[in-house]
């Protein structure tokens, strides 16, 4: 399973009620660093598909979600587990750093 688009409409069901941890990528199509880590996020979605849900939130299309989560720079990665925020990282990061955000929650 690849990444899914997270919206205000599906946030509660896909993130807060998820039985597995959820890695959220707040991004925008005009963001250079977002374009750099986008393929890495997609790789992680494929490699951890049985243990982790990966969602992408386009801040241009979902400004209310970005504001609710206090997103001030992108990319920003958040990890939710059992309906609560468990980890976060702002800025582009190498794959191993992204994996370390959620590895101990699996």
Predicted regions and their residues:
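A short beta-strand-turn-helix
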Residues: 3-22
